[in-house]
Each structure stands twice: as C-alpha cells, then as structure tokens.
Amino acid sequence: AQTCFEGMKAYTAEDGRIVCFRPDLNAARMAKSCERLKMPVYPEDKFVDAVVQTIRANEAWVPPYGSGATLYIRPYMFGIDAVIGVKPANEYQFRVFGTPVGPYFKGGVRPLTVRISDLDRAAPRGTGDVKAGLNYAMSLYNIVDAHEKGFDENIYVDAATRTHIEETGGANVIFVKGNTLVTPKSDSILPSITRRSLVYLSLIHI
C-alpha cells in the first residue's frame, strides 16, 4: 500500500549530449511523498545519483535527437513487509528503471477532447499533492470510462465546492489569457515541475 514514485525523461540534445531536466526537483518531491506516506525519506543526493547511474547504464537506449522519443526514468519506493495490519512497513526498497518511450503526443501536438469529471481525484487535506501510487490507481476507472466515451482526458474540479478547475488525470492545467498566465492554486493538486518552470519563465519574460 505504501508506494510513491517519480517520472522524468532523458533526452539526446542537438549536440549529442544526454540531458535530464531538474532531477533534483523530482528528488525533493519524492522526499515530500515519503514523509506524507510515513516512509523513510530517500536522500535527495542519492536519488539524483541513482538517476544519473541508470541513464549512464542505459545510454545506448536513449533515442536520437529529433526522434521525439526519450528514455523514461521511473524511480519508485515501496514497502516490502509481509504484514496484514494497517501500519507502516519496517522495510522498503528503492528502485529505478528506464525504458525508451515514443512521443507523449503521438502524431504531434493536437487539441484534446476533455470532460469535467463527475468523480473526484483528491480531497482537501488528502494526498493529492504527493505522487502516491494510490492516487493513480483511483483514477483508472475514470480514465478508462472517458476513453470509452470518446474523451482523451478528464478535468477534475475541487472536491469541496466543485466550482474550481484543479488538474487533469495526468497533468496540471495552465491557461493563457492575453499576457497573463493563470494556473489553479490548490493544496490538493500535484506540484508539477513543468508548471513551476513555466511560471518562473513567465515571471521573467511575460
């Protein structure tokens, strides 16, 4: 039951170097997830080193520049005790694996057909702001239902009032109105590293 994870990608740059975007922020986010799930915090420097070692060991599997493909890196941690009771595990494993993946948007970037979900993804003061496996397991029914009905993704609104957009099942939401960038402020959505970077850049350049 105690499982948290991160996800990032290794890219081949135009000059041939292999790069990975801000793994230090993934390390910090996993530390927060571990604390919330009563798991021992994996040291952030060791997290980054494990990611770098995994990329180096799989360098031959990093797709070439211009292909749109990447090497997906998945660090994850989980309890391994053989216990029945509802309590934190005594032993844990931290692992990292990598696999080549194609472009996230197959066929290029295109508009998505989305729906406002009737179900809630996370509750106030719950676990929506950490990258816990349970959050994604709970959304499987809803995303399968959306696909069966012709939608690409679900838009989740706040569980308390159901009046404010929060995020999709797989990403944060950002709106651009003129020269203004607008993104939901909520304690029940995952703090996206991509969103953080876009907000930072917008403050400098917009």
What are the residue ranges of the model-derived segments?
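Short, contiguous acidic and Ser/Thr-rich linear segments
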Residues: 188-191
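Feature representing long, continuous alpha-helical segments
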Residues: 196-200
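Conserved small/polar residues in nucleotide/adenosyl-binding loops
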Residues: 204-206
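Extended Lys/Arg-rich, glycine-bearing segments that form polyanion-binding/interaction patches
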Residues: 23-149
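Glycine- and Gly-Pro-enriched alpha-helical subdomains that act as flexible
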Residues: 163-185
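Short beta-strand scaffold segments in enzyme catalytic cores
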Residues: 8, 155, 173-175
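Short acidic-glycine loop/turn motifs at beta-strand connectors
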Residues: 11-16, 23, 80, 100, ...
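Conserved phosphate/anionic-ligand binding catalytic regions in large, soluble enzymes, centered on
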Residues: 2-8
